[in-house]
Each structure stands twice: as C-alpha cells, then as structure tokens.
Amino acid sequence: MIVDISKKPDVFRYARASANADVKKCNTAVAAKAATVASRYLPFLHPLPLSATAWCKDGKFYVEGIAHWQTGVEMDVLFGVLVGLLGSGAVKIENLRVEIKQKQTTPPIIENVNTSEAPITREGDLVASAYGRMKVVNLDIVKNPVEKGHPIYAAQTAAALNAKRLCELLGGPCPSVQHFKIEIITSDSVEVRTFIKARDITPAPEALFSAGVALLTIWDMIKKYEKDENGQYPYTYISELHLD
C-alpha cells in the first residue's frame, strides 16, 4: 500500500544521506538524478518534485535533497547515495545512513555543487553475489505485516524487479539475467544475500543494487517505528553492503 498523504500540508522537506566507500571517481551526477526518480524503484515512495545534489569528501559520498511537498525525502537521498556509489564503481559500501532530515515552513539553503559523471566499468564473472546488513531498532516489526504490507515479501519482490533495472540509471548495456535469488534473514539485524547469473556481462553491480533496494524497501516500510523523538534515525543504517 502507498500511504495516503492527500491531507498532509505542503512544507519544505530536506534530508542529507551519506555512506563510506573507497572509490577512484565520484559519479555525483548519477547520484543526484537517481534521488529524483527513487519512487520508480522503491515501491512505496511517493513521486515528488525533488531537487538534489551530490558530492564526495574525505572518503564519504553525500546526497542531499529538498522538496516542497507532503512527505519526507530521506529515502530518496538514501537511494541516490546507493546508486551514486555503484555508478562510481564501489564494491563495498559502509554506514549508509540519514545524517539529518528536516521539515520547515521556509526553504533550507543548499549549496550548488557541480556534479560529474563517469561511465561505469564492469569487471567480473557472469555470476555474482552480494551481502548486506542493516541495523534496526525494531527487528520484530520486520517479521510481520505493517501498514504498507509485509516488509520481507515486499523487499524480495522489489529486489527481483530491480535486478534488471540498474542500467536505466547508470547507462550502458543491461546484463541478460538468467537467474536471480534472494535470502533475507532477521537475527540480530536484517541480513540480505542476493545471487545473480547473467548470460553476457557481469551482473556484479546488479547484485549489490538488488540487495541495497531490498534493505531500503524494508527501511521505508518500517521507518515510522525507527524514528526517535526528533524524527531522526540515529540507530537505523545499512552497516555494510559488499560483493561476496
């Protein structure tokens, strides 16, 4: 279910997300663009008129966004960081988190940053697998249906669909996926493993992307339970996402 926001007022919504990764290039243009279209890939997000920018500094990748709208933009900028780092060639991402989110009646000031774009380089075998782990406050909620549906089932479906769509965001050829599977485990955290086999080019970025989408889908579905009294997410983050 996509939550009804029709009675909410339009206010300025701002969020900044970041993650750590060792990359030689920063595909910030792809990150900013991905944030603006996140609702096409994360199934329960509302389309919104997001303005986004991205930059790299001291081993961290940042995306921030603002919209005058009825719902928050934190999931959109998280998605932007994920796609931006994959477009930058990252094979290991750590501490993907929301640094801050705000709701206010006056527009926040965001800096104009020159974004850059670089073609993705695909290297690897025709079989790829990825692992991701997300820390959450309310692990039991992940295991049962919530207002939007069942987090695990929705995440499995979103991952499978998005395993074939990363090339829309990064450009270049799309792997001809022959097999995909996903496993989601809830123990002391939310763990995801994906496996992809392709016919022609390596699906390594797709393995990472589908695992990341699964975790972000779960986060989006339970986010109302993860916020603290100030509406922030101090204890919810994707601690690791990497190729196996």
UniProtKB/Swiss-Prot annotation:
Class of this enzyme: lyase
Q: Which reaction does it catalyse?
A: (8S)-3',8-cyclo-7,8-dihydroguanosine 5'-triphosphate = cyclic pyranopterin phosphate + diphosphate
Q: Where is the active site?
A: D220
What pathway does the UniProt record associate with this protein?
Cofactor biosynthesis; molybdopterin biosynthesis
| A Pfam family the protein falls into | MoaC
Q: What is its EC number?
A: 4.6.1.17
The organism's superkingdom is given as Archaea
| UniProt-recorded Gene Ontology molecular function terms | cyclic pyranopterin monophosphate synthase activity
The protein's UniProt keywords, in alphabetical order, are: Lyase, Molybdenum cofactor biosynthesis
Which BP terms in the Gene Ontology apply to this protein? Mo-molybdopterin cofactor biosynthetic process
The free-text function statement in the UniProt record for this protein reads:
Catalyzes the conversion of (8S)-3',8-cyclo-7,8-dihydroguanosine 5'-triphosphate to cyclic pyranopterin monophosphate (cPMP).
Would you identify the family this protein belongs to, as annotated? Answer: Belongs to the MoaC family.
Q: What assembly does the database describe for this protein?
A: Homohexamer; trimer of dimers.
Protein name, please? Probable cyclic pyranopterin monophosphate synthase
